[in-house]
Amino acid sequence: MNMSCKFEIVLLVSWWLLLVLVFGVESSMFSEFDRLDFPKHFIFGASSCAYQVEGAAFEDGRTLSTFDIAAHSGHLPGNGDITSDEYHKYKEDVELMVETGLDAYRFSISWSRLIPNGRGPVNPKGLEYYNNLVNALLTKGTQPHVTLLHSDLPQALRDEYGGLFISPKFIDDFVAYADVCFREFGDRVLHWTTFNEANFLAFGDENTPASALYLSAHHLLLAHASATRLYRENYQASQRGFIGINVYAYDFIPETNTEVDVIAAKRARDFFIGWFVQPLMNGEYPLTMRKNGGPRLPKFTPNETELLTGSYDFIGLNYYTAKTVKDDPVMLTVEPRNYYTDQGLISSYLGNIDPYQGHPFFNTPWGLHDVLQQFKQVYGNPPVYIHENGEVGDHDADYDKLINDIPRVEYLQGHIRAVLDAVRNGSNVKGYFVWSFLDMYELMYGTKFTFGLYYIDFNDPKLTRHPKLSQKWYSRFLKGEKASTKASIHTPNEAETHTYFY
């Protein structure tokens, strides 16, 4: 065998090893697959959020939420006053879900629509709307997956608390609100999520000081665990449903292969994901947080530890892209110390772009696979739903480009394939939801950048829903057509690292 042949073999083996590291199976990113490759009861759906999709912000007894105030005070671009108007068009949207072939629709309940003052009497019109939506979905064979709080706290409660989640009063108020939802809808809703992106929720709003983040998270965790206990004690046996929490997840990868960056990437995971997931496993914050946070990090009492441990039937994950992490010990010398400085690191989006300024997410399905491997190996392989995953697009682009959203198709293909590979490698993934079903008001972008499978011209009074190429692809996939992942995927090379860790 000559040297040229040896070099070619070494090169081929190197590429194969990279594919195994990234996807866990040999060259799977180039193979076809279909939904029958997934487990029999695997759920495919799409997601939304009450404030972002419903509209009717000032109708039928709904009162102001924190999102309304943030939007109308200029802290968010635009507002959700009308947005996609699903409040009035839910029947049409349910028909579109059936046409698409969704197994499930994940939506949230507007607390300020159901209980306008945050506590006290239930709004009959709000109750009627959510009953109608749930019934319409079930009539068409679509499962409702319901989130109790997608960040939009009633403004009346925020005013009373003096901040979003800094008051322990929030715990009892949330449990009382959850009780109403379980009682009124639990005979038909079998999948409940307490909080969407609980780790981001803890960051509060523009008025939340960095010193308050630990306390906010503490109250959110105790509110989740208390609502879970209520559900299990009073409802689960008869309603036979499931309850969990949702967190936002990045794949944190070290900027270099140095030991300090590898450790820093693990620390980033502990401070962002483990912050909310680890207490559900053993009733304690991650060791790195306890060490670096010191007295700033609240401690759980023995009763709270018992309450938290095992307080989930599933974990929901929202995943869009990966971030690189660099160790920065100088952060640990900054005073006063807080959640951010305690991490001792700097994290950056791949390519140093900021997707929250409208740049497309780097297409990193390998990162989703990596996160699922972490949940299997670090957190005991709990049941997981991918609750949000999707690609942002410029809503101001020309119509043909908006409708023929090839980058979104490539993004979805790659990430669904990554989920399949994770399942085959033993990850306990139960379902996948696209973000989002419709173009709608986005909290970071207004209506300038959107994620929907259906295009909506927000200047059209009829708000007509137009299927995009991504909707057609997803529908064909859900109905049995094979998909291929020969797509434009950003490789780990673009992060200048091949280090993967669990």
UniProtKB/Swiss-Prot annotation:
Optimum pH is 4.5-5.0. The active site is at E197 (proton donor), E388 (nucleophile). Gene3D superfamilies: Glycosidases. It is found in: Vacuole. SUPFAM superfamilies: (Trans)glycosidases. Pathway: Pigment biosynthesis; anthocyanin biosynthesis. The keyword Iron does not apply. InterPro entries: Glyco_hydro_1, Glycoside_hydrolase_SF. Its EC number is 2.4.1.299. Optimum temperature is 48 degrees Celsius. One of its GO terms (cellular component) is plant-type vacuole. GO terms for biological process: anthocyanin-containing compound biosynthetic process; carbohydrate metabolic process; pigmentation. It is an enzyme of class 2 (transferase). It catalyses: cyanidin 3-O-beta-D-glucoside + 1-O-(trans-sinapoyl)-beta-D-glucose = cyanidin 3,5-di-O-beta-D-glucoside + (E)-sinapate. Its main location: other. It holds the Pfam family Glyco_hydro_1. This is Cyanidin 3-O-glucoside 5-O-glucosyltransferase (acyl-glucose). The lineage of its organism: Eukaryota, Viridiplantae, Streptophyta, Embryophyta, Tracheophyta.
